[in-house]
Amino acid sequence: MVKLFSCKAHDGDYFWLRYKHDEEKLYHNLVIDGGRKSNASDFYEMLKHICKNGEQIDAMVLTHFDQDHIMGMFAGLQKAQKKNYIPKIAALYLNTGKGYWKHHQSLEGSEPLPEETVKIPMTDAPGYSANDLKKLTDFLQEYGLEEHICSYIVQSCEEIHIGNAKCYIISPSDCEFS
């Protein structure tokens, strides 16, 4: 059984996919994005439902860090933490600068590119906030989810197993970004 919820969040909708085989008692959950901060209560209710049913979030994916994709997740997680309704989160997929550097430094033949050689001020523009992404990742690390964060998913195309289902994150390749 598969259930897909498209959760309206103005211009930053998010998705909640629930999946289980007939013989399974609990649903597997995949969450994509989190909507705007104004939708934090809806995101919290989803987390509460998952937690009360004794389920986990098998994979949470942030497609990119615009405020209309991360702020509902961040504020919803904060509310759920206060009420002790954060379910176990098995894996969180997002792209971060730290993940980018780790990936490229690990490639054969690549010259080390220390982060110190690149100085980019942390700035916010309307609708885009690197500071908000930093706050979210800090929260996730403080909550003990650091080892569950996959911080570089560009051209990953790795299989993500959710129960007996296989999912793929599809993204442009490094070449397409150059």
Model-derived features: where do they sit?
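Amphipathic repeat-derived elements
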Residues: R18-K20, V31-R36, D42-F43, H64-F65, ...
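A short acidic (Asp/Glu
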Residues: W16-L17, H69-A75, H103-S106
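Active-site environment of divalent metal-dependent phosphoester hydrolases
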Residues: D11, S38, F65-M71, G99-W101, ...
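Flexible, acidic/histidine-containing loops and adjacent segments that form or flank the divalent-metal
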Residues: M1-V2, G76-S178
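Conserved beta-strand hairpin/beta-sheet module of binuclear metal-dependent hydrolase folds
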Residues: M1-Q56
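Active-site metal-binding motif and surrounding structural segment of the metallo-beta-lactamase
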Residues: K25-H28, S41-Y93
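Divalent metal-coordination and catalytic microenvironments
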Residues: K8, D33, H64, L92, ...
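Histidine (H) residue identity feature
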Residues: H10, H21, H28, H49, ...
